């Protein structure tokens, strides 16, 4: 089933949220007066322009966004992922999954330019040991694992899946735990599946368990795991009682029991991306829009713990992004947070951590990633 992101939003009932009052997208300010100056530099990262069939490779050099190269994808792209060893980039398209080798931010297509799987992966991630590519196709009630060679990035055998499949085909996003022992799949109104994963087994998947949505009218859009495997995060719609009803649900990883105080308000309608900060002190949620604006909003939370009891507190300020923000990434230096936006003229925003207010994000870059509309729909960074 060939399915673009717009089609998935239609099927999950999310596209009606995207209407704007003026020309579909709200207007963006062209002023850069709100930008903070920085001299910091980042690692390499890759932005996927879905509408223009491009992967753009970037890094930040002393505060300046620097383009490495632009690559035309073999067919209409959907998503991408970088392997933890930073040697390979995997590209999901309507024609299947391709693999590229990475060298100093430059890409070279591998496997003689052919696909390594015919699956139209909507979401994917490589396991921490680089041995499996986990991927799922929206519209198919399953999640797949492709065994990989850690030296070539190519498949070494047939793909595997849970014996029972998944209880829902409304696939939104997947995540692999940092230790590689669980796979999580956000399945829209079908809730979130968690599956034990044993890399050394011929079929690494265990039995599927489902966490239902907080509200019967809600949908699980995003999922992520704390870098130290303390907490599991799920972003859902219709999870709070405010007009901006998006919620961040938080579970203790060891028991998958929900924290007191969860769900936490995200300040927007559709929590499309969750970014646990690499140091483990903060977590950020990108809302694609709010009840009053198509401008994306990033909500930040501070994580506290006492005797293995965890709590989150919202930062006093939130952080604006671009039009319909859909994905976040942290760079390999742990100094930058990047956001991509599918609408408007600023396809990419970059932030650094504020030097005074712990965890706050200061916007330092706002830029197009091509001749708009490009639909910058995914981002992946070198680890």
Task: Put a short name on every predicted segment.
Residues 39-41, 82-86, 126-129, 176-180, ...:
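Residue-level detector of Asp-centered blade-edge/turn motifs that repeat once per structural unit
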Residues 64-72, 108-116, 157-165, 206-215, ...:
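A short beta-strand motif characteristic of beta-propeller blades
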Residues 51-53, 96-97, 139-142, 189-191, ...:
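Short glycine/acidic-enriched loop and turn motifs that connect beta-strands
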Residues 76-81, 119-126, 168-175, 218-224, ...:
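Repeated scaffold domains used in trafficking and secretory/extracellular systems
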Residues 57-64, 100-107, 145-154, 194-205, ...:
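Short loop/turn segments immediately following beta-strands, especially the blade-tip
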Residues 11-44:
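Bacterial Sec-dependent N-terminal signal peptides
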Residues 342-352, 358-383:
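Blade-level signature of beta-propeller repeat domains, shared across WD40, Kelch, NHL, RCC1
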């Amino acid at each position: 089933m060939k399915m673009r992101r717009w089609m998935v939003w239609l099927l999950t009932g999310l596209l009606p949220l995207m209407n704007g009052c003026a020309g579909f997208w709200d207007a963006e300010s062209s002023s850069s007066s709100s930008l903070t100056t920085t001299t910091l530099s980042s690692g390499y990262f890759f932005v996927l322009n879905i509408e223009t069939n491009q992967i753009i490779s970037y890094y930040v050099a002393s505060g300046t966004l620097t383009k490495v190269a632009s690559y035309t994808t073999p067919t209409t792209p959907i998503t991408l992922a970088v392997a933890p060893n930073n040697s390979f980039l995997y590209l999901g398209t309507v024609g299947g999954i391709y693999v590229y080798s990475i060298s100093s931010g430059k890409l070279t297509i591998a496997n003689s330019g052919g696909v390594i799987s015919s699956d139209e992966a909507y979401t994917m991630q490589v396991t921490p040991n680089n041995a499996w590519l986990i991927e799922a196709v929206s519209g198919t009630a399953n999640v797949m694992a492709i065994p990989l060679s850690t030296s070539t990035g190519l498949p070494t055998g047939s793909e595997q899946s849970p014996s029972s499949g998944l209880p829902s085909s409304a696939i939104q996003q997947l995540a692999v735990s940092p230790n590689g022992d669980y796979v999580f799949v956000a399945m829209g109104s079908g809730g979130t599946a968690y599956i034990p994963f044993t890399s050394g087994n011929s079929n690494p998947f265990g039995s599927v368990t489902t966490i239902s949505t907080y509200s019967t009218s809600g949908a699980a859009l995003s999922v992520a795991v704390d870098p130290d495997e303390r907490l599991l995060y799920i972003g859902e719609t219709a999870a709070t009682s405010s007009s901006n009803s998006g919620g961040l649900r938080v579970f203790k990883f060891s028991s998958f029991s929900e924290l007191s105080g969860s769900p936490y308000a995200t300040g927007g309608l559709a929590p499309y991306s969750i970014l646990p900060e690499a140091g483990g002190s903060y977590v950020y949620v990108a809302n694609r829009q709010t009840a009053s604006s198509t401008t994306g909003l990033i909500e930040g939370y501070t994580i506290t713990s006492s005797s293995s009891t965890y709590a989150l507190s919202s930062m006093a300020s939130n952080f604006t992004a671009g039009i319909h923000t859909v994905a976040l990434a942290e760079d390999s230096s742990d100094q930058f947070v990047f956001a991509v936006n599918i609408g408007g003229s600023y396809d990419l925003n970059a932030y650094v951590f504020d030097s005074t207010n712990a965890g706050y994000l200061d916007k330092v870059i706002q830029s197009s990633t091509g001749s708009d509309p490009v639909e910058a729909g995914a981002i992946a960074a070198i680890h």
